[in-house]
Amino acid sequence: MDKNTITGLVLIGILLVGFSYLSRPSEEQIAAQKKYYDSIAVVQQQQEALKAKTEAALANENKGAAAAADSSALFFNAMHGTDSKVSIQNSVAEITFTTKGGRVYSAMLKEYKGQDKTNPVVLFDGDDATMSFNFYNKQGAIQTKDYYFEAVNKTDSSVTMRLAADNASYIDFIYTLKPNSYLMNFEIKATGMEGKLASTEYVDIDWTQRARQLEKGFTYENRLSELTYKVKGDNVDNLSAAKDDEKDLGNTAIDWVAFKNQFFSSVFIADQDFNKVSVKSRMEQQGSGYIKDYSAEMSTFFDPSGKQPTEMYFYFGPNHFKTLKALDKGRTEKWELNRLVYLGWPLIRWINQFITINVFDWLSGWGLSMGIVLLILTIMVKVVVYPATWKTYMSSAKMRVLKPKIDEINKKYPKQEDAMKKQQEVMSLYSQYGVSPMGGCLPMLLQFPILMALFMFVPSAIELRQQSFLWADDLSTYDAFITFPFHIPFLGNHLSLFCLLMTVTNILNTKYTMTMQDTGAQPQMAAMKWMMYLMPIMFLFVLNDYPSGLNYYYFVSTLISVGTMILLRKTTDETKLLAILEAKKKDPKQMKKTGFAARLEAMQKQQEQLQQQKQNKR
C-alpha cells in the first residue's frame, strides 16, 4: 500500500466522523422524537386491550350459543362425565376399557413377559390406541370418542358400555371375553334409536395404534411388523414394513385388519365385512419405544332400529400358528388369522405348516430346552436330506477322479478357437464314463425347500421368545457378545457370537467344498472361489441382527455338513470308484447316457457341423 492510498483512507475517515458529528440531532429534537414514539406505544396498548375484550366477548357469545345447541343434541347428557376404567379378564388376558368413548383402553397378556422379563406384555395402553365410531343424525356426525359411556351389566369376563340419550334410547357396546382365549366378541346394538339416527345402514370407524417395541432388537422386529388385512374370499395382503405406506381399498370387502408386531397382534374382525377401507402405516424412530404407527378407516353394517346387532371381534394375542388356526374351528368362512405367522412361499409354507410345526411341537413336548429342540430338529433335517447330499458328493467324486483325463483334453486344445472341440470332447468323456456334470445340481435343488423352511420358521416361532441357551439369553433376537459404543454401517452396534460362528463354519465349508470340486477345467474358477469365500462374510453383515436361534441353526447345520463331507471322503475309495467307471466304459450295456448329457452332446455336434459348413463356404 503506497503513501497516497494511506493518505486518502485517512481523509475519508476524518470526513465520516465530521459528518456524523455535524448531522447529529439537537437535544430538543431528541426529546420531541421520544415523546412521539411514547404516544404511539400508548395507542398500540389501548388497541390491543380493546381487541382482547372483543375476542373474549365473542368467545363467551360462541360458548353460550354452543351450549344452547348442545342442550338439544341427542346425547347432550353424555357430553360431560368422569373418565373411569373398567376391566374384564380370563386366564390369559386382561382387557381394560375407558368410559370416555366406551373403547378398549389397554390389552395385557398374562402368559407373556415384556422386555424386562418380569411384567406381562402390554400391547397398548392409554392413548397408544384409539377407536371412534361415527353415527349420524340430522345434526351431523356423532363421534363416540367425544362422549362418556356408562358401564352396565359387568361380569368378570364381560361388560356393556352404554351411550344413553335417555332411559329408553341408547347404544350399547357389548364386550365379551371368551374363556381361555385371546378372542373377544364385540357387539353394537341400538335400543329406541329408530328415528333419532339417520336411516343409513352403516357406521364409520376410525382405529389407530402406535405399536410398541416389545422385543430387544428394533431392526428385526420392525422388519416383521406390518399392517395386514384379508380380502374377503381372497388372499392376505399387507402394507410395506420397510417404509411409510398407505392404501385405499375402496369398496373391496375386507374380513379383518391387523396391527401386527413380530410376535403379537391386535386384530379387528368384522362379521358382516368391512368396506370403504383405508389403511396407513408410518415408521417410528428407533429409541422412541415404538415400532410402527398404524391407522385404519372403515365402515361396516349398522342397523339403527336395533333389530339386527353389529357383530365384530377383537383378537389381542400372540402370533402363534396353532392358536390362530384354532379360531377357524367350526366356522364356514375361515378367517385364516394363522397367515399372520409368515412361513414362507407356498411350497415352503406347506412344509412348515404340515411338517416343521408338528415335529417342533412334538420335540417341545419332551420338556427339552429350545436350544436342544433346534439341535435335534437340525439333525433330523440333515438325515432327511442325506440321500441327496450323498448323491451330490458322489457326482463331485466322479468328476474329481476324471480330472487327470480332463487335464489331458485341456492340454490337447490350448487355443481359444478350439474351445468348442475341447468342450465337446469333455462331454464325450463324461458320456463314456456315465457321468453327468449336472448330476449334483438336482439333489441340491431338492434340499433347498427343506432348508429354507427352517429359515422361515425360526424367526416366526414365538416359542423361542425369551428362551435362553448357552450364552444367548433370548433365541428370538440377536446374542450380542460384543457391544460397540458406535454404529458400524451394515453391522450395527454389536456382534452376534452365533452369527460369527456361523460365518467361520461357512468359510471352512466353502474351503473344503472348493478343494473337492476343483476340476481345473475352467480358468474362471479363481474368480468364482473368491465369490464363494466372500458370501459368508456378507452373511455376517446381513444376519448379525437376525435371531440367535436362526444363526445357531445355520451354525449347527453347516457344522454337520462339513462333518458329513469329511466322513464321505474318508469312506469313499476313489481308486475303486475310477475302476468302476472304467468297467462301465468297457461294458456298453452298463452305460446309460443321461438325458442332459445326450442333449448337450447333440447340440455341440450340431454347432460343430454349422461351423464346418461356414468354413467350407469360405
UniProtKB/Swiss-Prot annotation:
It is a multi-pass membrane protein. Its main location: membrane. It is found in: Cell membrane. GO terms for molecular function: membrane insertase activity. Interacts with the Sec translocase complex via SecD. Specifically interacts with transmembrane segments of nascent integral membrane proteins during membrane integration. Required for the insertion and/or proper folding and/or complex formation of integral membrane proteins into the membrane. Involved in integration of membrane proteins that insert both dependently and independently of the Sec translocase complex, as well as at least some lipoproteins. Aids folding of multispanning membrane proteins. Belongs to the OXA1/ALB3/YidC family. Type 1 subfamily. This is Membrane protein insertase YidC. It comes from Bacteroides thetaiotaomicron (strain ATCC 29148 / DSM 2079 / JCM 5827 / CCUG 10774 / NCTC 10582 / VPI-5482 / E50).
